[in-house]
């Protein structure tokens, strides 16, 4: 009997990865990371693939330049990617510009079997056919094939120099036009501050920034199309509720700094059982005695505390999460499943979509399961973030009724 034919339609793979750690220990981590990434490519065999990276180049971009070049070269020329004969790479390497630098890197790969792929020129306001492999870096501001913005400094005044922002590209694949937005939102600067209120002050800052991005991508300047927003949203569990749940029967001890009287540590102890310490909380310490709670059943019992997306429920959709929190994993190359005791584990890395993009995916979901939302490298050290991906198919003809609207056929 002949082998089963591949599912019809155009296979799409969207991956988000905060890769800051990879450039701090390139020898060990990059090899692992690339092997696991290639495995996902091999499994899902996408025709169109997007990889959105945050903290590209690590904490010190200047020192990591050679590692960056090597990583990009490896991705573009590796054996695993040899069937992808067209590529676009956009790297924000302008690290000397506090005003503009976002440390975002966006990679787009097109399979040789894929015909007629177009990318939108935001300046000329028309689609252009994608040919060859091109890398753009340094000043992305002058590249007409994308829009890049860094969030205004007053969004996060505590942070002297934040690199948070977003990059948007627009594509036409299989007669479907969509925006792909690479995003990096603000983190929780202090566990103690995050614990004080529910929702936390930080979630309010992320809410404001994400609202700004969504307003930008559907404003009047360009025709509205479906969109996928994927990156490091830095969404955190509602800290106050989590601590109350994890430490229901605990008593709390407050430790203050002798000179300022400022709270520097909270210690939660069991009321009995020799007053065993359950949780220690400091600005950058979240040490819970039993990490298994974040791994049992992939941590899904904690999803009730993952509330930040609910504000956008009419504008952003997400498939059900069935993988464990994607951050903060140990950066020890021998530890693949261990979390660091720095933050409460959370689903920071996500692939979100507009309601119309959701329709596109659901149209494609036939009797066979062709949609997968998961993380990469569950048992291998991938750095402090596990990459997260969405694999789906655009069903044949899914975009046809709209083909005349977004004028994919009117190209240069």
Swiss-Prot record:
<comment type="subunit">
    <text>Interacts with TASOR.</text>
</comment>
<feature type="propeptide" description="Removed in mature form">
    <location>
        <begin position="410"/>
        <end position="412"/>
    </location>
</feature>
<dbReference type="InterPro" id="IPR039737">
    <property type="entry name" value="INPP5A"/>
</dbReference>
<keyword id="KW-0449">Lipoprotein</keyword>
<dbReference type="GO" id="GO:0004445">
    <property type="term" value="F:inositol-polyphosphate 5-phosphatase activity"/>
</dbReference>
<dbReference type="GO" id="GO:0046856">
    <property type="term" value="P:phosphatidylinositol dephosphorylation"/>
</dbReference>
<keyword id="KW-0966">Cell projection</keyword>
<comment type="function">
    <text>Phosphatase that specifically hydrolyzes the 5-phosphate of inositol 1,4,5-trisphosphate to inositol 1,4-bisphosphate, and inositol 1,3,4,5-tetrasphosphate to inositol 1,3,4-trisphosphate. Plays a crucial role in the survival of cerebellar Purkinje cells.</text>
</comment>
<comment type="similarity">
    <text>Belongs to the inositol 1,4,5-trisphosphate 5-phosphatase type I family.</text>
</comment>
<dbReference type="GO" id="GO:0030425">
    <property type="term" value="C:dendrite"/>
</dbReference>
<dbReference type="InterPro" id="IPR036691">
    <property type="entry name" value="Endo/exonu/phosph_ase_sf"/>
</dbReference>
<feature type="lipid moiety-binding region" description="S-farnesyl cysteine">
    <location>
        <position position="409"/>
    </location>
</feature>
<protein>
    <recommendedName>
        <fullName>Inositol polyphosphate-5-phosphatase A</fullName>
        <ecNumber>3.1.3.56</ecNumber>
    </recommendedName>
</protein>
<keyword id="KW-0378">Hydrolase</keyword>
<dbReference type="GO" id="GO:0005886">
    <property type="term" value="C:plasma membrane"/>
</dbReference>
<dbReference type="InterPro" id="IPR000300">
    <property type="entry name" value="IPPc"/>
</dbReference>
<dbReference type="GO" id="GO:1900737">
    <property type="term" value="P:negative regulation of phospholipase C-activating G protein-coupled receptor signaling pathway"/>
</dbReference>
<dbReference type="GO" id="GO:0052658">
    <property type="term" value="F:inositol-1,4,5-trisphosphate 5-phosphatase activity"/>
</dbReference>
<dbReference type="GO" id="GO:0052659">
    <property type="term" value="F:inositol-1,3,4,5-tetrakisphosphate 5-phosphatase activity"/>
</dbReference>
<keyword id="KW-1003">Cell membrane</keyword>
<keyword id="KW-0472">Membrane</keyword>
<dbReference type="Pfam" id="PF22669">
    <property type="entry name" value="Exo_endo_phos2"/>
</dbReference>
<keyword id="KW-0636">Prenylation</keyword>
